[in-house]
Amino acid sequence: MATAAGMGIGAACLVAPQVRPGRRLRLQRVRRRCVAELSRDGGSAQRPLAPAPLVKQPVLPTFLVPTSTPPAPTQSPAPAPTPPPLPDSGVGEIEPDLEGLTEDSIDKTIFVASEQESEIMDVKEQAQAKVTRSVVFVTGEASPYAKSGGLGDVCGSLPIALALRGHRVMVVMPRYMNGALNKNFANAFYTEKHIKIPCFGGEHEVTFFHEYRDSVDWVFVDHPSYHRPGNLYGDNFGAFGDNQFRYTLLCYAACEAPLILELGGYIYGQKCMFVVNDWHASLVPVLLAAKYRPYGVYRDARSVLVIHNLAHQGVEPASTYPDLGLPPEWYGALEWVFPEWARRHALDKGEAVNFLKGAVVTADRIVTVSQGYSWEVTTAEGGQGLNELLSSRKSVLNGIVNGIDINDWNPSTDKFLPYHYSVDDLSGKAKCKAELQEELGLPIRPDVPLIGFIGRLDYQKGIDLIKLAIPDLMRDNIQFVMLGSGDPGFEGWMRSTESGYRDKFRGWVGFSVPVSHRITAGCDILLMPSRFEPCGLNQLYAMQYGTVPVVHGTGGLRDTVENFNPFAEKGEQGTGWAFSPLTIEKMLWALRMAISTYREHKSSWEGLMKRGMSSDFTWDHAASQYEQIFEWAFMDQPYVM
């Protein structure tokens, strides 16, 4: 049967399906017997039979139906001719006696025959067309080119997942050189395209570099402000003073890239879906509405703001607004007033411009990196001053949990593990635990639960609670290992605690990717007492590796970790423990529940491990949810003032 892919949906629906010869003969016999019976009763004159139609006749709209009825015939219509006999099937058969059949029974026979014919023809087959889009990600970082946190992981993986689902995807980010040629950008070539951006009192030229990798167009905006020592956003003295200028250039360049860059021989054009990430890219929806749509450009484009961390909003003094190159009447979209307690002195009016607020106002849809976080940002506690504005846009606010890269985080293939294992064979995990204990200088004890922590050593991650709980935990028969850096005070505490509990505690100051993989695989329990966590990745890695998470029930942690329920049927419910509120008592209670289950209920513990390992946190799953957001965005009209 011809399909919609080759003929178009309408044409495909009008093609008669082919019937196999054997079944056609059986249908012909049934039809021949029915015709013979009706001819005997004289029914053919009133209702001639014909084969059941293969396709329903279309119903005309009411305005196409004739309003006048045709005149009645003056003479009786001539009797309908007797249908010619159908050709014999060539197969011998005994004709049944049809004397006792009524017309109603004949009708039923015809209905059954028609129903069989419909089944044979497979009329249920329908043409399905998937909408593919031109998607433009705008971000301050993307792995493996430049990364400082979870934002880089998302923007390095989600575009690839969308490209694998058939979309044309571009990622626009700065070309960070750190004062010298960065090997991460070695495969990007100069496109010979450059533009001059009118902002900050002049015209600033930027150029474009391009690399095609993993079915994605990676576009790098080049400017001298991206060529300096330090990290992406600052150095040892703090954030760079010209970050507003640096990311204004990025946003302007991202708006121009789909119009001027012929990637693969074709530009992306105007019907794009812009996915802007955090404050660094938040000027893009404002530019689309203020500087492009009024002139007929990007009227068919839409934008989605993805909030990874609401704490960073790109706030600068109000006096910088004219530098952005926006019309004066658009000041209100970015206007921000600090509360009195946050002002520097009594004469400070607290007036500022807020990049992220501009995107919250003008973006067509808003996404947070978990469902729980989408609710938290509308509360006074979690909204960082934008809670009322975000609450007013609840109708376009959704949460989607980030995915993980199962090519990098897979216990059956992980290059950093001494032994591999899977949900069907967990024996390698016990060996990884023993190797980790030996590597860290801890006694090799398979019966002792090994608890781990991986993350920044700061207040947001709940390190202060861990510090308070360690003396109590060390009285129990457990081992505890921590990996991270941050607050110098917490770093010093880790070193001193290791000296006090040589056989039970290890603290690794700093960060090492191989060690983080081995801790994730070797530990039995992962502790995450974060005060807030928009999504969180470590709990996803832990479940992928059969390590049971104990987390504070906030943001993405609450969304992804299902509480263990020992009273469910066969105890088969839950992937960990999520405690709330965030107190030392609640945290210790959850940890002791996990420790008790590990020691005394081995089958329940194995179920926890396997359910976590079977959870679907792939980027493909997240990408399918983003596709739905794109559909919703294109259903509505774009933002205009």
Curated annotation (Swiss-Prot):
Q: Name one GO cellular component term.
A: chloroplast
One of the record's GO molecular function terms: alpha-1,4-glucan glucosyltransferase (ADP-glucose donor) activity
Q: What residues bind ADP-alpha-D-glucose, as annotated?
A: K147
Record's compositionally biased regions (Pro residues)? 68-87
Transit peptide extent on chain: 1-113
Q: Where is this region: Disordered?
A: 62-96
Keywords assigned = Amyloplast, Chloroplast, Glycosyltransferase, Plastid, Starch biosynthesis, Transferase, Transit peptide
> Could you confirm whether the keyword Transferase appears in this record?
yes
The processes (GO biological process) annotated in the record are: starch biosynthetic process
Q: Which SUPFAM superfamilies match?
A: UDP-Glycosyltransferase/glycogen phosphorylase
Here the disulfide bonds are none
Q: Which superkingdom?
A: Eukaryota
Localization of this protein:
Plastid, Chloroplast; Plastid, Amyloplast
Pfam families given for it?
A: Glyco_transf_5 (PF08323), Glycos_transf_1 (PF00534)
Reply yes or no: does the keyword Transit peptide apply.
yes
The reactions it catalyses are: [(1->4)-alpha-D-glucosyl](n) + ADP-alpha-D-glucose = [(1->4)-alpha-D-glucosyl](n+1) + ADP + H(+)
Stated EC number for the protein is: 2.4.1.21
Miscellaneous comment in the UniProt entry for this protein: Three forms of soluble starch synthase were purified: RSS1, RSS2 and RSS3.
Instruction: Please name the HAMAP family in this protein's record.
Output: Glycogen_synth (MF_00484)
The family line of this record is: Belongs to the glycosyltransferase 1 family. Bacterial/plant glycogen synthase subfamily.
Q: What is the protein name for this chain? A: Soluble starch synthase 1, chloroplastic/amyloplastic
Q: What organism is the protein native to?
A: Oryza sativa subsp. indica (Rice)
According to the entry, what is the taxonomic lineage of the organism?
A: Eukaryota, Viridiplantae, Streptophyta, Embryophyta, Tracheophyta
